[in-house]
A protein has these predicted regions:
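Beta-strand-enriched cores of mature, soluble protein domains
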Residues: 1-131
């Protein structure tokens, strides 16, 4: 079982759209915020979520998502992070549930779970160790 080691809160900065070679719509959203963990302490966090889907699936209830970002720790250390997983529209709510697994540049495996509130564009979540 994964151990909870931290929490984070990020706010939306900007979204851009493009098309890939398959003609899918690619959504790229940038976020910034802060987080803390029992293993690394506090950090400023910046990252990008990327998802792609055909135009005909624009109103889907779920899909794949990936995250690429960096954490800037209070001690000056910079850590890269990558993760992939899924998003799902919450039933009867204006929000998305996101669950991803990935690793950081220190080699630690992590799971991230959280909710994006689409009214105020805030992503709050928890970090779990998979080591």
């Amino acid at each position: 079982m994964a151990e909870k080691i931290g929490e984070f809160s990020m706010e939306h900065v900007v979204t851009s759209y493009s098309r890939n070679a398959n003609g899918d719509i690619v959504s790229t959203t940038d976020w910034k915020g802060s987080g803390s963990s029992t293993t690394l302490g506090g950090a400023q966090v910046f990252g990008t979520f990327i998802s792609a889907a055909p135009l005909s699936e624009s109103n889907e209830k779920s899909g794949e998502i990936e995250f690429i970002g960096e954490s800037f720790l209070e001690n000056g250390t910079q850590i890269g992070n990558v993760a992939s997983g899924a998003w799902e529209k919450a039933e009867n709510e204006h929000s998305w549930k996101i669950s991803m697994e990935g690793e950081n540049s220190l080699g630690h495996k992590r799971r991230y779970e959280g909710t994006v509130d689409l009214e105020n564009l805030i992503f709050n979540g928890e970090i779990y160790s998979l080591d």
